Curated annotation (Swiss-Prot):
Protein known as: RPA-interacting protein
Presence of keyword rRNA-binding: no
Gene Ontology CC: one annotated term: fibrillar center
Residue positions where Phosphoserine is found in the record: S18
Gene Ontology molecular-function annotations: zinc ion binding
Modifications after synthesis and translation: Sumoylated; required for localization in the nuclear PML body and transport of RPA complex in PML body. Upon UV irradiation and during S phase, it is desumoylated, releasing RPA complex that is translocated to sites of DNA damage. Sumoylation takes place at different Lys residues.
Keyword Nucleus: yes
Length: 219
């Protein structure tokens, strides 16, 4: 079906900009793509890391370009000279910008994938450290934990009375490793550990992950 002459997509290809207009449009599109990082990565995760080039990827690039075009056409942002332009658009103008947006998208996803690989490497190192050495404090990841009279302590200041009277280093190690492995089964990011609780309640050891918005009480 023929596209309406007044549609945003046709408008995008109808009017032309001089080189200064092209640069303004290019910079605006790149900024929008960078600000759409969260949206892009959500789509990438939902596609389970499929190869770039799908219809949804192309839709995001087009969406970014049309949003920036509409922004430039607004009364506040659009130069008067641009509003008066009626020359046919040189398609190479948009093709160049579209390719640059594709490159930016690939760069964002490449950076994300490298981060996942780094997180996986750190997670494996942390688990190996727990298995090979005295139990490392998951909060400071520097000193060894000590368990005495059912109280877990660390030189970093961690001090947590346990509800279990028979808590041992082996049991705490198994609990930590079990929770970390359970989390890594559905999220590639490294969880963080912290101590919660104030003066009127017993402190607890909490494992949380901002990436998948989950948490668990370890101790």
């Amino acid at each position: 079906m023929a596209e309406s002459s007044g549609s945003p997509h046709r408008l995008l290809y109808k009017q032309v900009g001089s080189p200064p207009w092209k640069e303004t449009f290019r910079q605006g599109c790149l900024e929008r793509m960078r600000n759409s990082r969260h949206k892009l990565l959500n789509r990438y995760r939902q596609a389970a890391g499929s190869t770039l080039g799908t219809a949804s990827d192309r839709l995001l690039v087009q969406e970014v370009m049309e949003e920036e075009w509409n922004s430039l056409q607004s009364v506040e942002n659009c130069p008067e000279a641009l509003l008066q332009l009626e020359l046919p658009l040189n398609l190479a103008v948009l093709q160049d910008i579209e390719q640059e947006l594709w490159n930016e998208e690939k760069s964002i996803i490449s950076e994300y994938e490298k981060g996942l690989q780094f997180d996986e490497s750190c997670l494996n190192s942390m688990l190996a450290e727990w298995e090979a050495n005295p139990l490392i404090c998951p909060v400071c990841i520097k000193y060894n934990l000590r368990i005495m009279n059912s109280v877990v302590t660390c030189p970093c200041g961690l001090h947590i009375p346990s509800h279990s009277t028979d808590l041992t280093e082996q049991k705490l190690r198994a609990c930590l490793e079990g929770n970390v492995n359970e989390h890594s089964a559905h999220c590639p990011h490294i969880p963080e550990f912290s101590v919660t609780g104030g003066t009127e309640e017993k402190p607890s050891l909490l494992m949380s992950c901002l990436a998948c918005d989950t948490w668990a009480v370890i101790l």
